[in-house]
Amino acid sequence: MFRIVNGEDYSPEVQQRNSLDFGKAPSLLWTDNGGSNDRCETGGNGRESGQDRVKRPMNAFIVWSRDQRRKVALENPQMQNSEISKRLGYDWKMLTEAEKQPFFEEAQRLRAMHRDKYPGYKYRPRRKAKRPQKLLPADSSVLCSRMHIEETLYPFTYKDGCAKATRSRMESRLSHSQPTNTTSSLLPQEHRSSWTSLSHNRVT
């Protein structure tokens, strides 16, 4: 059976007795979704092992969804577990209070049994590790200002995390190319200016 243990329960005699009693646990106290946070109370050392784990009593929805989940899974073998959960949540909301009442009563009975069996039980949910958030969403597109390169306008966009790297490369290229381009673009203008001045002197 599941027990809340302390530091004195780790003797060989107690460990052997717990292993013999492990297969006699009632099938009432289990959660419908094994991957949820409705986990357990840990032992005295803060570690969770197979025998130290005490699950929360089922609520009314879990009591109702036990048989419903099996039924939906058998009728729709290709349906994913997440889709089944969404469907069950919708179906539960559509039930009337009278239809839900038997399951609330059963959940209350299970809660009382759990309280009598584990008087010192306290629910401690597991903390989920935070995932690093991206600076830009995957589908974002930032339209940048147009840049004047060799007298031609070229619009471009930055996407995702490559924006800074692309912009730095473009700025590096422009810093090297702009002086040469500026000089080459000014040469024809100076030539035309000198030619115009010579023609003007000849006419006068």
From Swiss-Prot:
Modifications made to the protein after synthesis: Acetylation of Lys-130 contributes to its nuclear localization and enhances its interaction with KPNB1. Deacetylated by HDAC3.
Gene Ontology terms for molecular function: calmodulin binding; DNA-binding transcription activator activity, RNA polymerase II-specific; RNA polymerase II cis-regulatory region sequence-specific DNA binding
Subcellular localization: Nucleus speckle; Cytoplasm; Nucleus
Keywords noted in UniProt: Acetylation, Activator, Calmodulin-binding, Cytoplasm, Differentiation, DNA-binding, Nucleus, Repressor, Sexual differentiation, Transcription, Transcription regulation
Quaternary structure (record): Interacts with CALM, EP300, HDAC3, KPNB1, ZNF208 isoform KRAB-O, PARP1, SLC9A3R2 and WT1. The interaction with EP300 modulates its DNA-binding activity. The interaction with KPNB1 is sensitive to dissociation by Ran in the GTP-bound form. Interaction with PARP1 impaired its DNA-binding activity.
Protein family per UniProt: Belongs to the SRY family.
Stated name of the protein: Sex-determining region Y protein
Native source organism of the sequence: Balaenoptera musculus
